[in-house]
A protein has these predicted regions:
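Short, Lys/Arg-rich N-terminal segment immediately upstream of the first membrane anchor
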Residues: 1-4
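C-terminal amphipathic alpha-helix
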Residues: 31-77, 113-166
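Short, charge-rich amphipathic alpha-helices with coiled-coil/heptad character
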Residues: 17, 46-53, 82-91
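Short, solvent-exposed, charged loop/turn and helix-capping segments
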Residues: 74-106, 160-166
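Hydrophobic membrane-insertion alpha-helices, especially the h-region
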Residues: 6-22
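Extended, hydrophobic/aromatic-rich amphipathic alpha-helical segments that build helical scaffolds
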Residues: 104-116
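Transmembrane signal-anchor/signal-peptide helices with a preference for the extracytoplasmic
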Residues: 17-37
Length: 166
């Protein structure tokens, strides 16, 4: 093999390696860039959900419904962004990051289901069907408690791996 061939092979390997490094950096970088927006949407969704519950307890059904819809929109927005990040996972994506993203997706799916049940309960209470409204409210509460378990797992992952979460 000539020196010229060796140089060509070296350059090709260098280009492939550089491309892989850039791709991995961009995947992790895009995840780090998206996380503040995702976190803000989750916090806003939690706040809207809690406001919806307070408004429901005050029998302000229309306002409760509006807040619940806002919560659901915030949770869905975060979920869509996380699914996009998950679709771009590679075999080199850190297992802690994978676990974190999957945990937050599960948390959000439960929060979305809880919000859907809360919306159903609002409709039943508004129509004076309190027993059925109570059933949906209880289910919403159960789902939100399950979501909080995932939220605690997520928070522990961040606390245990501060170097991975900037």
């Amino acid at each position: 093999m000539s020196n010229y061939s060796k140089v060509i092979i070296f350059i090709v390997i260098l280009i492939v390696f550089s491309g892989a490094v850039i791709y991995l950096y961009n995947t992790e970088s895009s995840m780090n860039e998206a996380m503040p927006d995702i976190s803000s949407s989750i916090v806003a969704g939690d706040s809207d959900y809690n406001s919806a519950v307070d408004l429901l307890n005050d029998k302000s059904y229309n306002e409760a419904r509006n807040k619940a819809i806002s919560a659901e929109n915030n949770f869905n927005q975060s979920r869509i962004q996380l699914l996009d990040i998950k679709d771009n996972f590679t075999s080199d994506t850190n297992d802690v990051h994978k676990n974190y993203i999957n945990t937050v997706i599960k948390e959000l799916e439960l929060k979305i289901n809880a919000t859907e049940n809360l919306l159903e309960s609002i409709d039943y209470y508004k129509n004076y069907q309190n027993s059925t409204g109570n059933d949906y409210s209880s289910r919403a509460n159960e789902l939100m408690n399950e979501a909080l378990d995932f939220q605690n797992v997520r928070n522990n992952l961040v606390r245990e791996n501060p170097n991975l979460f900037k």
